[in-house]
Each structure stands twice: as C-alpha cells, then as structure tokens.
C-alpha cells in the first residue's frame, strides 16, 4: 500500500514543501525567519479579519469604532494590539530575513530574491494604509504627507495625487479606498509568498557556507519543524510580552487624538519601521530627488545579484565584507534614529551623511571590497 502523503494530489504538494523537503544540514537560526514571517502573516490576516468585523471606514466613525473595539468587544483590545504590534514584529522578522539574505548571498537565487523585494514593497504599502485606518492625527497627517510625495512626479503628479485621494484632500473617499486595499493586499501577499516558495524549492535552500550542499541534505521534518517550533514559541513570547506589558511602546501618542485637518502635529513621522526610508527622503532638499531616493533605497535590493563580484557566495569567509556589512547595519540604525528626530541641526547633516554612506556601501564599497578579497585569495 502506497503512502497517502506521497500520492494524494494535494497532500503530495504539502509533503514536498514541508515534510520530505531536502534541506541543508547546517542551516542556522537565521533560516527560521521565513516560517516566522508566514506565522506573522497568518496572525495579521486573522486579527485583521476580526477587526474588520467591527471597524467602520467612515471619517466620522472610524476613530470611535477603534475605541469601541478596545472597550466593548470581547478581547477587542487584545485583537487590536496583536494586529498593531504584530506589524512591528512582522517588520523585525522581515529586516532580519533580508539581512540574512544579504549576508549569506541568498540573492544569487535572483527569482526568489526579486519576488521577495516585491513582497517587501507590498507589505510596506499594506502597513502604510493600515496606519491610516484608526483616523488619528498621525494617521491623517501621515497619509497627507506621504501621498503628497507623488505630486513630485512631473506632469501627472498633481492629478495622480487627487485621483488617489478621491478629492482635493485626504477625506472619506481616501479612508474607504485605503480600507479596501488594506483588506485585499494581504491575500495578494499570501499568493506572492506561494510564488516565493515555488522559486525557492526549484533551487533548494542556501546555507551559511554558501557552498553547494546537495551531498549533505536532511528531511525538513522532523529536524527543522522542531527548530521552527522553537522560533514560533519565542516569537509568540516576545509579541505577547509587548502586547500585555507595553502595547503602546512602538506607537505614536498623537494617534490617540482624532484626526483634525486644521491642526498639524509638531512632528509628522511614520511608524518606526519606515523611519530609515523617511530619513533618506528628508535628507535631500529637492522633492523629486527625495522621492527617488526613497524608492531607490528599497529598490536597490534588486541590484544585489548584479553587484555581487566576489568569487565566494557567502560572507562567512570574508572578514572585510563582514565588517562593511555591520557598518551598513549600524548606518540603518542611525537612519532610523534620525527619521524620528526633528528637522534641525545636527540631525539634518547626520541624516545626509548616513544616506550617502548607505548608497555608497551598497553601490561602491561592498563590490570594491569583493574584488580586493578575490585578489587576496591568490596570495
């Protein structure tokens, strides 16, 4: 009798993806973030679904409906804060997942990598639209400022912004369409995740050494299922600790004030996970230049496969590149800090220097160091 797991048309796909999948025997904890991102997506879709049952996307009642969820719905406060802080944990996992790919050269699977970058854009768009929905001060002004950036596009900019707004300012039409897009995008993301995995399973996983590991593969289950469960438990522990002890730690107090078009908050800033890109945007005095830098700061990830000039795939045996990679990480922390500061001296110049360094490391310094390391191999 044949095993149903290996013959059933549907279960067979699951089997090849999560059970009998040949996996390198030496992948470290840095490879856990893929499954953790899957978990985050499931948490966000489920909590979001229950929030959508009680939320109203109308400028007059949106803020009140969120308050109603927190006060009157059974465990509504828990669902709301799981969704809000779940987004933060989602982005932490995303940044670590991308950083792992950069460090260990996973970007050489360029189909998988490019789908991943598209996923990053989709998640960022979803998170931005989600931030607008509670209709607090930072929701309203964040939406106004960020959508207004599109007016920098020559010729069609102003028309495009008014088309997105559905009027001449951020109002009811904007909120309704943002809710519609915020609801549908996670399902598109889930479909893209399937494509991401499809491309990954065509090539198999990378491993810390960056070497071909075909001769030393082990089945995914039970080895990595157990390993992933540990990651899942730790993620849930961190998320629940954040929710139950300090749910507003990563939020903005201004968002507890209902949106008021007549009163601008002293410092308009996005959620913490966009601050690095926001700092790059602000570091350029020209509007169009800032927008291009903002888009390119993420789009630059797509150039990684082209900028890989080293003879070795991973940075595991490349100490000079490692050093530069960690300087890049420190630079991103600096940009995140600057993005949350007011636009005044010395923050302006620090932001500009950090932005220049960010692009210089990726486009110039890392490829140059790779070539130097290639020369050192011959010594």
UniProtKB/Swiss-Prot annotation:
Further comment found in the protein's record: Heme 1 (or BL or b562) is low-potential and absorbs at about 562 nm, and heme 2 (or BH or b566) is high-potential and absorbs at about 566 nm.
Protein name listed in UniProt: Cytochrome b
Subunit structure as annotated in this protein's UniProt entry: The cytochrome bc1 complex contains 11 subunits: 3 respiratory subunits (MT-CYB, CYC1 and UQCRFS1), 2 core proteins (UQCRC1 and UQCRC2) and 6 low-molecular weight proteins (UQCRH/QCR6, UQCRB/QCR7, UQCRQ/QCR8, UQCR10/QCR9, UQCR11/QCR10 and a cleavage product of UQCRFS1). This cytochrome bc1 complex then forms a dimer.
Gene3D superfamilies noted in UniProt: Cytochrome Bc1 Complex, Chain C (1.20.810.10)
Gene Ontology CC terms, in alphabetical order: mitochondrial inner membrane; respiratory chain complex III
Family: Belongs to the cytochrome b family.
Function description: Component of the ubiquinol-cytochrome c reductase complex (complex III or cytochrome b-c1 complex) that is part of the mitochondrial respiratory chain. The b-c1 complex mediates electron transfer from ubiquinol to cytochrome c. Contributes to the generation of a proton gradient across the mitochondrial membrane that is then used for ATP synthesis.
Record-linked Pfam families: Cytochrom_B_C (PF00032), Cytochrome_B (PF00033)
Free-text cofactor note: Binds 2 heme b groups non-covalently.
Localization of this protein: Mitochondrion inner membrane
Keyword field: Electron transport, Heme, Iron, Membrane, Metal-binding, Mitochondrion, Mitochondrion inner membrane, Respiratory chain, Transmembrane, Transmembrane helix, Transport, Ubiquinone
Gene that encodes the chain: MT-CYB
Residues that bind heme b b566: 97, 196
Residues holding a ubiquinone: 201
CDD domains (UniProt xref): cytochrome_b_C (cd00290), Cytochrome_b_N (cd00284)
Record-listed heme b b562 binding positions: 83, 182
PANTHER family per the UniProt record, alphabetical: CYTOCHROME B (PTHR19271:SF16)
GO molecular function: metal ion binding; ubiquinol-cytochrome-c reductase activity
Membrane topology category: Multi-pass membrane protein
Cofactor(s) named in the record: heme b
Transmembrane segments: 33-53, 77-98, 113-133, 178-198, 226-246, 288-308, 320-340, 347-367
Biological processes, Gene Ontology terms: mitochondrial electron transport, ubiquinol to cytochrome c
SUPFAM superfamilies assigned to the protein according to its UniProt record, in alphabetical order: a domain/subunit of cytochrome bc1 complex (Ubiquinol-cytochrome c reductase) (SSF81648), Transmembrane di-heme cytochromes (SSF81342)
